[in-house]
From Swiss-Prot:
Protein name, per record: NADH-quinone oxidoreductase subunit A
UniProt key word Cell wall biogenesis/degradation: no
Compartment(s) of residence: Cell inner membrane
Any one annotated GO CC term: NADH dehydrogenase complex
Annotated InterPro entries: NAD(P)H_OxRDtase_bac/plastid, NADH_UbQ/plastoQ_OxRdtase_su3, NDAH_ubi_oxred_su3_sf
E.C. number: 7.1.1.-
UniProt keyword annotation of ATP-binding present: no
Signal peptide feature range: none
Main location group: membrane
Lineage: Bacteria, Pseudomonadati, Pseudomonadota, Gammaproteobacteria, Oceanospirillales
Topology of this chain in the membrane: Multi-pass membrane protein
Reaction equation(s) it catalyzes: a quinone + NADH + 5 H(+)(in) = a quinol + NAD(+) + 4 H(+)(out)
GO MF terms held by the record: NADH dehydrogenase (ubiquinone) activity; NADH:ubiquinone reductase (non-electrogenic) activity; quinone binding
Protein function: NDH-1 shuttles electrons from NADH, via FMN and iron-sulfur (Fe-S) centers, to quinones in the respiratory chain. The immediate electron acceptor for the enzyme in this species is believed to be ubiquinone. Couples the redox reaction to proton translocation (for every two electrons transferred, four hydrogen ions are translocated across the cytoplasmic membrane), and thus conserves the redox energy in a proton gradient.
């Protein structure tokens, strides 16, 4: 073995031992659970049970795509907040170049937000087309 390999082994032996110990512990727990765990079968064992109520109907429900859209917009703007927080922490070190980069980043995200707003991605319910009925007053 070369000196580099020996130095590498000396540096990372604890990490390798930890990984081996984690896998051994997981195998031990799974094996003990399969040997010692109870095995009872019955019709009530296969029913889903949540909060003291036995479920009725199908567990598969159709969700609107709007939920997915809201989740994606949340993730996008949450990542924006993480990047801007990192910039805010190091604002003194990055100087005007960093400020310009953050300004471009914010501008691009604001342009995306305006686009989402214009195409209706932020509206939960569709807009009603046409005129609204006139208000009739009673006398």
């Amino acid at each position: 073995m070369t000196d580099e390999a020996t130095a590498l082994i000396a540096q990372y032996w604890a990490t390798g031992l930890f990984i081996i110990a984690v896998f051994a512990l997981c195998a031990l727990m799974i094996g003990a659970a399969s040997l010692l765990g109870g095995r009872s079968r019955g019709p009530s064992k296969s029913l889903p049970f949540e909060s003291g109520v036995v479920g009725t109907g199908s567990a598969r429900q159709r969700f609107s795509v709007k939920f997915y859209l809201v989740a994606m917009l949340f993730v996008i703007f949450d990542i924006e907040a993480v990047f801007l927080f990192a910039w805010a922490v190091s604002v003194r070190e990055v100087g005007w170049e960093g400020f310009a980069g953050a300004a471009v980043f914010i501008f691009i995200l604001l342009a995306g937000l305006v686009y989402d707003s214009r195409v209706g991605a932020l509206e939960w319910a569709p807009r009603k087309r046409g005129r609204s009925p006139d208000i009739v007053t009673q006398r």
